[in-house]
Curated annotation (Swiss-Prot):
Protein name (database record): tRNA-2-methylthio-N(6)-dimethylallyladenosine synthase
Domain TRAM: 377-442
Oligomeric and partner information: Monomer.
Residue ranges of domain MTTase N-terminal in the record: 2-117
UniProt remark on cofactor binding: Binds 2 [4Fe-4S] clusters. One cluster is coordinated with 3 cysteines and an exchangeable S-adenosyl-L-methionine.
EC number: 2.8.4.3
Source organism of this protein record: Ehrlichia chaffeensis (strain ATCC CRL-10679 / Arkansas)
Primary enzyme class: transferase
Free-text function comment from the UniProt entry: Catalyzes the methylthiolation of N6-(dimethylallyl)adenosine (i(6)A), leading to the formation of 2-methylthio-N6-(dimethylallyl)adenosine (ms(2)i(6)A) at position 37 in tRNAs that read codons beginning with uridine.
Keyword Lyase attributed: no
Residues where [4Fe-4S] cluster 1 binds: 11, 47, 80
């Protein structure tokens, strides 16, 4: 058997795609290895959202080249950088053998055979008529899942935010059929999966037709909740413009749907939101938050923020800080704006100096850290439902799980196998910045 090494960058969709690539390549005679030095094929599944992610690729490729100089190694660049840069990757890193876009990964076995037999570079960054989901049997992307699993229900984006490359790298919005999603969930359930996370670039833009009716994400969630062994359902990443009434209703009535929503806003300034082409206001975002809290009072929120968008004034930034204070997030992700080639905002005037970006991101992250720590500390003394999905904690006698609110929860135990793949009531006894600790409630 030859070795296969896959490294994923970025979003959950890339993790999902990496699993697909692993399962369709292994029948060619490969086994997964933990180190690139042990591999005969290395796949770097890339992200293109931020400038540093692209540069990380070329840094990693330099390491792969050194390995390639000592052995027969096929180097594959997959994912969104592959889609965006295409042939430019060969020009910048001529030792790369294969470039494949995220919508063409189902052709990877063919590309590998072609590249290795013909000793030539090959590329496929097409947006094929037949989607990768139609080309790959469901069994190939449900293998090797454990306690929690992703299910891709939607890909692509039609929103065209001015800072974002996703519409150009993932293509237009595409929703899988209800039957395909349900069948995948059934296979996962039969294999022991207890928690599914429905993923998509704009997951709540999901739409389909089934049994003569129109379906959206809320209706899909309530249908999947009927699968007996699936005990938890999550979804990510959502967009404020696609919050439909059925999704509110699902949060109110479906106990399997976890009380946690990742809902990016990017900025609290209406002026900046307009320049970003988000097509919603800060007030509309707050209304969504309040409506979700009305349906599920214990719900927690995370979000994404971009600091230093072109033309952002101090007043604009203060609007963001005000929104953060009003919502009170349990966790959030914040980034300094970095211009992505080919996006409208890369050409905007009034680019913000790095020094100002750094000052603002420090202030924002300080506030977000305060909120996250306060949220975690507020859990002390409460009993949470925790799914233990990781056998390895910081120490040998620990096991890690996730609360309903996506907090990492550690417990001490001499037998990690006893709790693995279990959902247990845990009394929280201590809290930290990024985690909580607890004890099992008898």
């Amino acid at each position: 058997m030859q070795g296969l090494y896959i490294k994923s960058y970025g979003c959950q969709m890339n993790v999902y795609d990496s699993l697909i690539m692993e399962n369709i390549i292994k029948p060619l005679g490969f086994t997964v290895v933990n180190e690139p030095s042990e591999a005969n094929i290395v796949i770097l599944n890339t992200c293109h959202i931020r400038e540093k992610a692209s540069e990380k690729l070329y840094s990693e490729l330099g390491k792969m080249r050194k390995i390639q100089e000592t052995k027969d190694l096929t180097i594959v660049v997959a994912g969104c950088v592959a889609q965006a840069e295409g042939e430019q990757i060969f020009a910048r890193a001529p030792f790369v053998d294969i470039v494949v876009g995220p919508q063409s990964i189902h052709t990877l076995p063919e590309l590998i055979i072609k590249a290795r037999r013909m000793k030539k570079q090959v590329i496929n960054i097409d947006f094929p008529i037949i989607s990768k989901f139609d080309a790959i049997p469901v069994e190939e992307y449900t293998k090797n899942q454990e306690v929690s699993a992703f299910i891709s229900v939607q890909e692509g984006c039609n929103k065209f935010c001015t800072f974002c490359v996703v519409p150009y790298t993932r293509g237009e919005e595409y929703s899988r059929t209800v039957e395909a999603i349900f069948n995948e969930a059934l296979v996962l359930s039969d294999s022991g999966v207890k928690e599914i996370t429905l993923i998509g670039q704009n997951v709540n833009a999901y739409h389909g037709t089934y049994k003569g009716c129109e379906w959206d994400l809320g209706k899909l969630i309530q249908y999947l909740a009927k699968i007996p062994n699936i005990e938890r359902i999550r979804y990510t990443t959502s967009h404020p413009r696609d919050m439909h009434q059925s999704l509110y209703e699902a949060h109110r009535s479906e106990t399997k749907l976890m009380p946690f929503v990742h809902l990016p806003i990017q900025s609290g300034s209406d002026r900046i939101l307009k320049k970003m082409n988000r097509k919603h206001t800060a007030e509309e975002y707050i209304d969504i938050i309040n409506n979700l809290r009305k349906q599920r009072p214990d719900i927690a929120f995370s979000s994404d923020f971009i600091v230093g968008f072109p033309g952002e004034t101090e007043e604009d930034f203060e609007h963001t800080m005000k929104l953060v204070q009003e919502v009170n997030f349990s966790q959030a992700y914040s980034f300094k704006y970095s211009p992505r080639p080919g996006t409208p905002s890369a050409e905007y005037p009034n680019q913000i100096p790095e020094e100002i970006k750094s000052q603002r991101i420090f202030r924002l992250q300080e506030l977000l850290r305060e909120q996250q720590l306060a949220f975690n500390r507020n859990m002390i003394g409460q009993t949470c439902s925790v799914l233990f999905n990781n056998k390895k904690g910081k120490f040998d006698n620990q096991i890690i799980g996730k609360t309903e609110y996506m907090q990492s929860c550690y417990i001490n135990t001499d037998n990690t196998n006893q709790f693995y793949n279990s959902i247990l009531p845990i009394k929280i006894i201590d809290a930290y910045q990024n985690s909580v600790t607890g004890i099992v409630v008898n």
